[in-house]
Amino acid sequence: MGKQSSQRVFSQRQLRVGELVKQNLGELFIRNEAKIPNINSKLITVTEVRMTPDLKTARVYVIPLGGIDMRETVSALTEYSHLVRKALSKRLDIKFLPKLTFVEDNSFEYAEKIEKII
């Protein structure tokens, strides 16, 4: 399932770096700095970034806005993650730039299902 099934506790360092990556990815997408072909990155929302304990991998949860196909967006981001990572490296001054793994954020769909049940 989505990010709801994870019950892990994250360290303050993981949370801090994850938030830093999230903010910079959001700005990067708004300004279209990654230049991803066939994707309007201004319509991509980064909802959460989860870092591994060694801070070398980041799971980036995204939602495309404006009726754009989520699977298509995530596959394009995955295919061109090297461009996103390169653009991110210009913004962040951290020891290791994390490998980015893009994931569909289904939390809003999950919330809708719960609301319908209630």
Regions found by a protein language model. Name each.
Residues 1-57, 63-118:
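Charge-rich, low-complexity N-terminal segments
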